[in-house]
């Protein structure tokens, strides 16, 4: 759920869409949610248009949209454009755009996105961004939850059926199992942050986790398919 292509700060070079597709092709991952980094880094409208245009010929990739939370006055137009294009997922880049959970622009973007039934792909610390999203019926996938912070997420997930976390940073020996056995497999989705991280550790952790085959399938594909429906 967290595939990017294009330039990225602190990364040694641009990674083209073609290269990302090659990496996925040579991995166990058969499909992904992706977007161009032009949207969060330079121009949200142009970036969304680029993502839709580029991914139109990539059947294994589903487009993700974004908006610039620093310019929430234009967010409504951007979200309407994404909805018209059938985009279900909105990725927020609060770190790159210096957006705190209490900022007016952030609150406005979230309000507009939830009103349109969009799924938030959310960066940052869930301990900070999760509580303001509780009690709102939100579908949120937290992308940056570290294994050390898992207990706080589990407490929120007990109350929020729409809160999910990716496997990417759940590096503890039983992190995947803790999520599945504590709150259910529906709260976990596969994530690797291709191409900026090696995809192998995430796939191996999921493959050998002590969970049932049905739970493994839900984490790998089923939960995202449900969000797409």
Description of each model-found segment:
Residues 6-9, 39-43, 70-73, 97-98, ...:
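Active-site environment of divalent metal-dependent phosphoester hydrolases
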Residues 19-23, 47-54, 78-82, 105-109, ...:
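A general structural detector for well-ordered alpha-helical segments in enzyme core domains, enriched
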Residues 102-189:
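Catalytic pocket-lining loop regions of alpha/beta-barrel enzymes
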Residues 3-4, 19-42, 60-66, 87-95, ...:
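Divalent metal-dependent hydrolysis catalytic cores, especially in the metallo-beta-lactamase
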Residues 2, 24, 51, 55, ...:
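Conserved, mostly hydrophobic/aromatic
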Residues 1-3, 13-31, 200-229:
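Mid-to-C-terminal alpha-helical segments outside catalytic/metal-binding sites
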Residues 45-121:
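Active-site gating/metal-coordination segments in enzymes
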Residues 1, 33-36, 64-66, 91, ...:
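Active-site neighborhood of phospho(di)ester-bond hydrolases with catalytic His/Asp-centered motifs
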């Amino acid at each position: 759920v967290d595939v990017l292509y294009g330039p990225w700060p602190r990364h040694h070079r641009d990674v083209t869409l073609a290269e990302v597709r090659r990496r996925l092709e040579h991995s166990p991952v058969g499909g992904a949610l992706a977007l161009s980094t032009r949207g969060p880094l330079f121009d949200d409208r142009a970036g969304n248009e680029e993502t839709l245009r580029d991914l139109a010929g990539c059947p294994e990739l589903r487009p993700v949209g974004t908006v610039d939370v620093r310019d929430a006055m234009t967010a409504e137009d951007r979200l309407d454009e994404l909805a018209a294009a059938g985009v279900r997922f909105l990725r927020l880049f609060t770190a790159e755009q210096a957006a705190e959970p209490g900022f007016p622009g952030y609150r406005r973007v979230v309000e507009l996105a939830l009103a349109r039934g969009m799924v938030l792909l959310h960066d940052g610390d869930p301990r900070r961004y999760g509580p303001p999203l509780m009690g709102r019926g939100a579908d949120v996938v937290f992308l940056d939850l570290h294994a050390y912070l898992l207990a706080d997420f589990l407490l929120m997930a007990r109350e929020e059926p729409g809160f999910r976390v990716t496997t990417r940073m759940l590096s503890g020996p039983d992190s995947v199992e803790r999520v599945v056995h504590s709150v259910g497999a529906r709260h976990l989705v596969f994530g690797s942050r291709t191409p900026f991280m090696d995809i192998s550790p995430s796939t191996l952790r999921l493959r050998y986790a002590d969970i049932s085959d049905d739970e493994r399938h839900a984490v790998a594909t089923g939960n995202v398919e449900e969000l797409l429906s």
